[in-house]
């Protein structure tokens, strides 16, 4: 009787793991790539040191399968380069383009003039195009 019980528990667990590992390929991330930032909204172009403001970026996504993944935020002194990334899922999605808004918090720790460069794609010569914004920190 104990042997039958052990075998049934093993069979039950094996069946559970077989079903739980049966993954649906839809909604899996297929690709992550940079997406151009179309525009930027900075509420205050002058702010105090150690205060926080949210900087918003707007990007156009080609379908409902494409969504915001994150930012690459590179600091170099008082200069900031910002590149947005999107991910694409493998699923049944509408192909209508849409504008997505995302943001990040900026909290300066020293006074000065900060220059932000937001990646806006590449030109015909394959050179990066940047949207430049400045924030004066007092």
Model-predicted regions and their roles:
Residues 3-5, 14-39:
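Bacterial Sec-dependent N-terminal signal peptides
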Residues 5-6, 136:
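Sequence-pattern detector for short linear motifs
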């Amino acid at each position: 009787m104990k042997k039958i019980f052990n075998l049934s528990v093993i069979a039950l667990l094996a069946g559970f793991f077989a079903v739980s590992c049966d993954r649906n390929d839809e909604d899996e991330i297929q690709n992550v790539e940079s997406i151009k930032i179309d525009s930027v909204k900075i509420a205050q172009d002058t702010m105090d040191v150690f205060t926080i403001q949210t900087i918003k970026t707007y990007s156009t996504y080609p379908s409902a399968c494409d969504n915001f993944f994150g930012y690459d935020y590179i600091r170099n002194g008082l200069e900031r380069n910002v590149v947005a990334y999107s991910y694409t899922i493998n699923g049944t999605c509408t192909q209508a383009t849409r504008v997505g808004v995302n943001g990040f918090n900026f909290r300066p720790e020293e006074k000065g003039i900060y220059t932000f460069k937001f990646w806006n794609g590449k030109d015909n010569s394959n050179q990066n195009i940047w949207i430049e914004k400045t924030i004066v920190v007092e």
